[in-house]
């Protein structure tokens, strides 16, 4: 589907997860993706902000340039075992357009030369090599409002090998320095190498040349061996490299102090939300798995903040786990070890590349970058971050200067008869004695005052803080593989201990720990309090959707009497008369697409399912889901975002940023949150809204501009605020049509998000590049409150 001003460039942007190999160096700083051959539109001149990574990770630069500046790509590809391994894909989009616009004729693409990476055009559906059904035509489609007849065409597509093209190269020029939060930082500007692109005026051919630096062109063979290795083994702890006793037990962030009084803006969005995208360099990791940081948003200008490293490590760990799990499910016979083996293997992969933090370092007190309320799905994550090193034992300890054992952390997850409540006091049962829930039938025995028990006892006199991690039942994930989350509860002091006879008739040790005052409260405690009360404090609307979503979305205001702004709620995109979605060709998978090697929808995603257990595996250029004519059931693994909201969300009044969005339950990393829905506009319509564009979301590139307007008609996505350290990212998804210039904007979780934490994504505004209707530069302060906040929204 296209509109009346389509251009030849539409034939070039045939991106998806595998149809067009694309680098994650084209992923934006908010996690979204920009096709290497066409960017999201932004009319204003763009500057660059660089975020540096470790040497083996390369650097990430926000590719924010003016349309006249061109780009150069570094390409990494793979040598396949045989010709059949190369999957040649093509777009299957049927589009409608008004006569009079230029339409590119389809030329056959003969070959792909890895030396110059010239990209040509290929024939349409014939190159797929899979059996697809023709889409049903809508005979009840309303007539076009245009006086001219509609014409259906099949856009040309691009054929490339299946693997990703890697790397976008840009140069930085230091232009000066500035003071920010008491620090002196360098201000740089992107100087992009030139990249040639030619478009024939007669509309017959469209070819793009990509220059490649020879030293960055890497050909790698894909191994097919057993990547999991022998039977599972218990992961051994690393020997201590250094131990640290902190002088300060609790590190508290300074409160946010707005520098000016805010007016009644509904949400922080003002001017255009732009989903500019930058991809990140991938490095070879193992025979089948490579680590990338998946288009992760930068958390600081230098990329070396402790908080950023924690988030990066967790994102890499979960991406690796999901890939291993997908490979394991594809095996004809499952091997012993199950989920524990997978997380151990993922942990070993990260450690082999130096992506673990403090796991060999013993720390007393606060672990850098870890905040109270952080949630984890696996205990192995605690090991990677150095929060709690043992993969199974409940007590972690070390030797102090005098050679005495002291406790550093405990995990209270229900294995023993611990007293868990909402107070700041924890009664913890010691370890040993076969008291816990064991698979074997060993008889219980008295616990001994040794190792971890002795360390907790010594911590009474030492008065050293002990980290407490609580295990909380998790009901968010679709499967029951993960039974609980692990939540960092903060620092406690051990006050006393005693012996008592347990229910099994043997002696056990009990330890009383008290939470150190001044730390943030765990959000699940607040959720539990609200569930107990009959009426919700501050509730001003029980359902802003008026029943249009599968779950009600309430509005809460505990600050004043203001009500949510009036608007018409729509759960789906609204297309104008000149743009009519035509369903894509379908797959014939009647039992779901999880194990079908010949599924047309999986082929369009590069032969890999983009989701696992209802969560996205990694950030992709474009995700194709099964369409309305596919024969698979609604429960198909390829239908995640099209079924609407599945997480309990609410809007709430913030102190300084209008209305925001949060969840009443834990959100696992990779979970679908919601769509950014509204009315589709042409760019010329959007330009007329200057000064009234708080809810505009730009689509397409600078030559094919489209915009979603959620001002009058929209969904909960219109309330999601900006953050310089976001926990969501925007992912392009297609399912009801295949016009890649008008994708659905779907928000997915970048991290494990605890309850009541505000949801946010990066608007990607440019400082001093936003103007009012008179051409004057507009300035707006940022109140996101993150440690990496730049201080200005634009």
UniProtKB/Swiss-Prot annotation:
Key word Transport present: no
Keywords annotated in UniProt: Centromere, Chromatin regulator, Chromosome, Methyltransferase, Nucleus, S-adenosyl-L-methionine, Transferase
Biased composition (Basic and acidic residues): 258-276
Main location group: nucleus
Region spans: Disordered: 187-210, 254-276
Gene Ontology MF, one: histone methyltransferase activity
Domain Post-SET span(s) in chain numbering: 778-794
Expression sites by tissue: Expressed in leaves stems and flowers.
Family of this protein: Belongs to the class V-like SAM-binding methyltransferase superfamily. Histone-lysine methyltransferase family. Suvar3-9 subfamily.
The protein's name in its UniProt record: Histone-lysine N-methyltransferase, H3 lysine-9 specific SUVH5
Originating organism: Arabidopsis thaliana
Gene it is expressed from: SUVH5
């Amino acid at each position: 589907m296209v509109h009346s001003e389509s251009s030849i460039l539409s034939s070039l942007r045939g991106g998806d997860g595998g149809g067009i190999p694309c680098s994650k160096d084209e992923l934006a700083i908010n996690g979204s993706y920009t096709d290497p051959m066409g960017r999201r539109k932004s009319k204003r001149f763009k500057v660059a902000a660089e975020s540096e990574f470790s040497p083996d990770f390369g650097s990430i630069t926000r590719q924010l340039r003016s349309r006249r500046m061109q780009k150069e790509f570094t390409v990494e590809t793979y040598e396949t075992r045989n010709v059949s391994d190369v999957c040649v894909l093509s777009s299957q989009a049927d589009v409608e357009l008004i006569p009079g616009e230029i339409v590119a004729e389809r030329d056959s693409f003969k070959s792909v030369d890895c030396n110059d990476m010239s990209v040509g055009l290929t024939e349409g559906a014939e190159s797929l090599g899979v059996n697809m059904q023709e889409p049903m035509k809508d005979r009840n489609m309303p007539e076009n409002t245009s006086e001219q007849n509609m014409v259906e065409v099949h856009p040309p597509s691009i054929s490339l090998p299946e693997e990703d093209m890697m790397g976008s190269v840009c140069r930085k020029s230091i232009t000066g320095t500035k003071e920010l939060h008491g620090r002196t930082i360098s201000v740089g500007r992107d100087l992009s190498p030139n990249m040639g692109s030619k478009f024939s005026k007669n509309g017959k051919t469209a070819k793009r040349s990509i220059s490649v630096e020879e030293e960055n062109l890497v050909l790698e063979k894909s191994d097919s061996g057993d990547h999991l290795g022998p039977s599972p083994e218990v992961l051994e702890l690393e020997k201590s490299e250094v131990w640290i006793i902190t002088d300060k037990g609790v590190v508290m962030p300074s409160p946010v102090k707005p520098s000016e009084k805010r007016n009644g803006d509904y949400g922080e969005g003002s001017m255009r939300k732009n989903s500019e995208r930058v991809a990140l360099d991938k490095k070879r990791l193992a025979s089948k798995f490579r680590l990338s940081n998946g288009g992760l948003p930068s958390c600081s200008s230098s990329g070396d903040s402790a908080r950023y490293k924690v988030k990066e490590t967790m994102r890499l760990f979960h991406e690796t786990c999901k890939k291993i799990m997908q490979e394991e499910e594809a095996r004809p016979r499952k091997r012993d070890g199950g989920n524990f083996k997978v997380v151990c293997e993922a942990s070993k992969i990260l450690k082999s590349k130096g992506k673990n933090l403090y796991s060999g370092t013993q720390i007393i007190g606060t672990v850098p970058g870890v905040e109270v309320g952080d949630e984890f799905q696996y205990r192995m994550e605690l090991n990677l971050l150095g929060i709690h090193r043992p993969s199974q034992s409940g007590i972690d300890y070390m030797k102090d200067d005098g050679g005495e054992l002291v406790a550093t952390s405990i995990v209270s997850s229900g294995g023993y008869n611990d007293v868990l409540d909402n107070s700041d006091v924890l009664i913890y049962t010691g370890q040993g004695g076969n008291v816990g829930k064991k698979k074997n039938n060993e008889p219980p025995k008295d616990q001994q005052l040794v190792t971890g028990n002795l360390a907790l006892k010594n911590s009474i006199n030492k008065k050293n803080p002990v980290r407490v991690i609580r295990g909380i039942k998790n009901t968010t994930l679709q499967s029951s593989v993960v039974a609980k989350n692990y939540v960092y509860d903060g620092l406690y002091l051990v006050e006393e201990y005693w012996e008592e006879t347990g229910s099994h008739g043997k002696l056990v040790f009990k330890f009383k720990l008290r939470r150190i005052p001044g730390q943030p409260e765990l959000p699940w405690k607040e959720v539990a309090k609200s569930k107990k009360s009959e009426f919700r404090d501050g509730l001003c609307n029980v359902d802003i959707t008026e029943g249009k979503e599968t779950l009600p979305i309430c509005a809460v205001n505990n600050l004043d009497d203001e009500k949510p702004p009036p608007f018409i709620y729509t759960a789906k995109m609204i297309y104008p008369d000149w743009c009519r979605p035509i369903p894509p060709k379908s797959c014939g998978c009647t039992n779901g697409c999880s194990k079908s090697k010949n599924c047309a929808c999986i082929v369009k995603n590069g032969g890999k399912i983009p989701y696992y257990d209802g969560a996205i595996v990694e950030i992709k250029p474009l995700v194709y889901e099964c369409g309305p004519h596919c024969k698979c059931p609604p429960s198909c693994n390829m239908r995640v975002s099209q079924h609407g909201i599945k997480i309990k969300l609410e809007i709430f009044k913030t102190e300084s940023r209008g209305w925001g969005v949060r969840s009443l339950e834990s959100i696992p990393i990779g979970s679908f949150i919601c769509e950014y829905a509204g009315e589709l506009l042409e760019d010329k319509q959007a330009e007329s809204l200057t000064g009234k564009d708080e809810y505009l979301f730009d689509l397409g590139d600078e030559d094919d501009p489209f915009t979603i307007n959620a001002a009058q008609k929209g969904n909960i996505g219109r309330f999601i605020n900006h953050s310089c350290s976001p926990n969501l990212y925007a992912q392009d998804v297609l399912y009801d049509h295949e016009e890649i210039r008008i994708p659905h904007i779907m928000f997915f979780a970048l991290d494990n998000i605890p309850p009541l934490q505000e949801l946010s994504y990066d608007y990607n505004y440019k400082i001093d590049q936003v103007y009012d209707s008179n051409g004057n530069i507009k300035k707006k302060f940022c109140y996101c409150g993150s440690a990496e906040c730049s201080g200005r929204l634009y």
